[in-house]
């Protein structure tokens, strides 16, 4: 038993070291510049000393005003998450157009993350079309920052900050997010870009 356990332990230790040295830094900063990673963003003050602090970014050939409506309508039972719909939107295809009736999101509203609305993230603050912060103070925040570039494009920066509660049952979900969040977020940013740039449209009827 001991002879079989040792190789498994060594393999697990090696994998953990490789992830900590290479995988985690990459996934926590995908697409973002060092300056974007280190700069303060709205909502940072709501979660101090986060265990998980991820800043990702993408350049979109559209203005903040053109991108903002796509962010206002996200959520399960709304426009979806523009990510892997089979996983985060009950298999329903995320919207490929702006939905007028979903443009009234405001601080105090909840962005739904489950079909029954019991799971969701509150909108904490909003500065259209520059920034929006979701989350629960002291636990987790999700910030969207839109910075206009001189050429008419936008740097869309997203930051997720959370503190792991190691002795809580929620730690299982936190660790799941640790390893899967990058793939969902990357897909969402790429699909947001394509929609805002007009590369994704509704099929002809």
Positions of PLM-derived features:
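Short amphipathic, positively biased membrane-proximal segments
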Residues: 1-57, 65-66, 79-81, 145-155, ...
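Short, solvent-exposed aromatic-acidic interface loops
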Residues: 137-138, 159-165
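Short beta-edge strand/loop motif at the mouth of beta-sheet-based domains
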Residues: 49, 75-131, 203
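A conserved amphipathic terminal alpha-helix motif
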Residues: 166, 170-205
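Short, solvent-exposed secondary-structure boundary/capping segments
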Residues: 130-137, 154
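Structured segments of extracytoplasmic/periplasmic soluble domains
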Residues: 70-77, 195
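Hydrophobic pocket/interface hotspot
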Residues: 67-70, 123, 156-158, 192
């Amino acid at each position: 038993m001991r002879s079989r356990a040792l190789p498994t332990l060594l393999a697990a230790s090696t994998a953990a070291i490789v992830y900590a040295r290479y995988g985690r830094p990459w996934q926590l900063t995908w697409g973002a510049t060092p300056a974007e990673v280190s700069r303060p963003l709205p909502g940072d003050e709501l979660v101090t000393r986060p265990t998980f602090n991820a800043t990702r970014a993408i350049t979109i050939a559209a203005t903040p005003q053109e991108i903002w409506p796509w962010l206002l309508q996200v959520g399960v039972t709304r426009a979806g998450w523009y990510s892997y719909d089979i996983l985060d939107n009950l298999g329903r295809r995320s919207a490929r157009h702006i939905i007028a009736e979903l443009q009234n999101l405001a601080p105090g509203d909840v962005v739904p993350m489950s079909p029954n609305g019991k799971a969701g993230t509150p909108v904490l603050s909003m500065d259209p079309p520059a920034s929006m912060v979701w989350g629960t103070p002291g636990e987790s925040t999700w910030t969207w920052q839109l910075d206009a570039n001189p050429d008419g494009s936008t740097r869309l920066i997203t930051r997720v900050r959370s503190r792991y509660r190691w002795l809580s049952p929620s730690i299982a979900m936190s660790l799941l997010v640790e390893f899967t969040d990058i793939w969902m977020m990357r897909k969402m940013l790429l699909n947001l870009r394509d929609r805002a740039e007009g590369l994704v449209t509704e099929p002809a009827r």
